Design a protein with these regions (language model features):
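Active-site and adjacent substrate-binding regions of carbohydrate-active enzymes
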Residues: 1-174
Length: 174
């Protein structure tokens, strides 16, 4: 599904990592390139980062997600809204463009970007030729940003930065 619980594992509905490695090997024999569908906009509420953020008020993952700031007048016209979850510190409001079970990641956070680079490196080193990124235009959604923020510029800059990082790992990446 699109509510990611582990970026570095094969969804059991599709098989095992051994199955994936065999797919890559068999495709390579036939000169077939494999691209992976990645979701960098959000995770599942069952993802370890989100669970740790709820359980631990000082979690390093707290700023991996977008939290509501009542002093901000958020934009409109995009997708999603803020949702509530309850953790050790009480009520936490986080943004989810698609569902309350899919909290959006804070893609402006350099630590989140470093995680994305690690994820791409993991799959590229396993033989993947490139990626298709789901929900690419929602990385910075109007509804999660202060009113008037140029979200399309933020989106473009984010993807240029990630593409440059992928090229450093694998120069001929798709």
């Amino acid at each position: 599904g699109y509510d990611v619980k582990d970026y570095m594992a094969v969804n059991p509905q599709y098989g095992t990592m051994a199955d994936f490695d065999q797919l890559i090997a068999e495709c390579a024999k036939r000169n077939i390139k494999v691209i992976l569908d990645l979701v960098f906009n959000h995770t599942s509420t069952s993802h370890p980062w989100f669970e740790d953020m709820l359980a631990n008020p000082t979690s390093k993952y707290r700023n991996y997600y977008i939290h509501k700031d009542n002093s901000i007048n958020y934009g409109t016209g995009g997708m999603g809204s803020f949702h509530a979850a309850y953790g050790e510190e009480g009520k936490i409001e986080y943004f989810g463009a698609f569902s309350p079970t899919m909290p959006d990641l804070n893609c402006a956070n350099p630590a989140v970007k470093r995680e994305f680079v690690k994820i791409m490196k993991f799959w590229l080193e396993r033989g993947v030729a490139g990626f298709r990124f789901d929900a690419a235009k929602h990385i910075f959604d109007q509804n999660e940003l202060p009113n008037g923020t140029a979200n399309m510029t933020l989106n473009k800059d984010f993807w240029v930065e990630l593409r440059e990082a992928a090229i450093k790992i694998k120069p001929n990446v798709f």
